[in-house]
Amino acid sequence: MALAGAPAGGPCAPALEALLGAGALRLLDSSQIVIISAAQDASAPPAPTGPAAPAAGPCDPDLLLFATPQAPRPTPSAPRPALGRPPVKRRLDLETDHQYLAESSGPARGRGRHPGKGVKSPGEKSRYETSLNLTTKRFLELLSHSADGVVDLNWAAEVLKVQKRRIYDITNVLEGIQLIAKKSKNHIQWLGSHTTVGVGGRLEGLTQDLRQLQESEQQLDHLMNICTTQLRLLSEDTDSQRLAYVTCQDLRSIADPAEQMVMVIKAPPETQLQAVDSSENFQISLKSKQGPIDVFLCPEETVGGISPGKTPSQEVTSEEENRATDSATIVSPPPSSPPSSLTTDPSQSLLSLEQEPLLSRMGSLRAPVDEDRLSPLVAADSLLEHVREDFSGLLPEEFISLSPPHEALDYHFGLEEGEGIRDLFDCDFGDLTPLDF
């Protein structure tokens, strides 16, 4: 190693060489040495050199050596550490549940974790079982089973197997929101809902009522299905269409005429019906946009009289009853009777309301008919042929036909104050002789 930074033959060079030769200094090849020496007096003799040289006296120069520290040179096989980062001391082991393990594990410092800590014993309760939420639910369940809503807190703590202070925590909250009230020190009463007292019996009764309603609903659905099937067969079956009619006797057999009034409603399709059932009276509202609505009264059959559904009877006392007879007429005649057509034109009405008292005294107008067999009403012309002789003394010789007959839509219009019934028909009533009664 060469010395640099000092002139050759300087006073410090021999001393430094002596130190290096003796092995007193261990320097590397890359070490740098800085030598600082003090000035020497020129009159002083030179100091001897060599290992046996005496120590320098007060006049000897001071020699200060400074070496720059250097890190050891890395070997070519070792990886060079990254600048600014500490060397990696851990590695990732994916086979040990993603845990970082040290390369060399030393003895654990401090107190180690007990191996049995965190493992619950079989008899230990979970956190949810001891929670206040579950305890409150169980306490309210005890309140619901109480007959009068009063619960002893000591008994509740024993049943729930919890500390009494937790029962007090629950009761304090419930008392604060006015759901319970303290009867005494250890007794509380439920005030939230009085329906909870004895709710089991009421629940059983309501369940039974619901079961009965479901059975009734199923029975009604079954009857509605039967009626729907019968109506479809009645309207679609050819053999059943000829029997699609109803008589006054059928209507009177449904209800007692002495206590109930039977009314027949003849309405066009798509008629809206609204019924209001109140405690005082019963109201029915009908509304139709397709045509007029006819309402007929089914009269009560008197003793010795004949049903209006068989032949015209003198028992009919109003125009509504005459119209009820028309509605009860057979739509299609049975096979035993000859086919005939029924018309409801005003020209075929027999008598007015003023002539009916006279007919009531004429017993000959009653034609004998079979009570067991029903026949449709015949036309007015055929009836006049049978009773023409009986009317000879009371009525004119001929009836005037009111023509042309009006249709259903013609009755939607009314008459003015100066018009009468003759203005509805194109005929002359001047030749008619007034009837004197």
Swiss-Prot record:
Residues 195-284 are annotated as: Dimerization. Residues 409-426 are annotated as: RB1 binding. One of its GO terms (biological process) is response to lipopolysaccharide. The modification N6-acetyllysine is found at K117, K120, K125. Keywords: Acetylation, Activator, Apoptosis, Cell cycle, DNA-binding, Host-virus interaction, Methylation, Nucleus, Phosphoprotein, Transcription, Transcription regulation, Ubl conjugation. Residues 192-382 are annotated as: Required for interaction with TRIM28. Residues 153-174 are annotated as: Leucine-zipper. Residues 42-87, 101-128, 300-349 are annotated as: Disordered. Transcription activator that binds DNA cooperatively with DP proteins through the E2 recognition site, 5'-TTTC[CG]CGC-3' found in the promoter region of a number of genes whose products are involved in cell cycle regulation or in DNA replication. The DRTF1/E2F complex functions in the control of cell-cycle progression from G1 to S phase. E2F1 binds preferentially RB1 in a cell-cycle dependent manner. It can mediate both cell proliferation and TP53/p53-dependent apoptosis. Blocks adipocyte differentiation by binding to specific promoters repressing CEBPA binding to its target gene promoters. This is Transcription factor E2F1. The gene is E2F1.
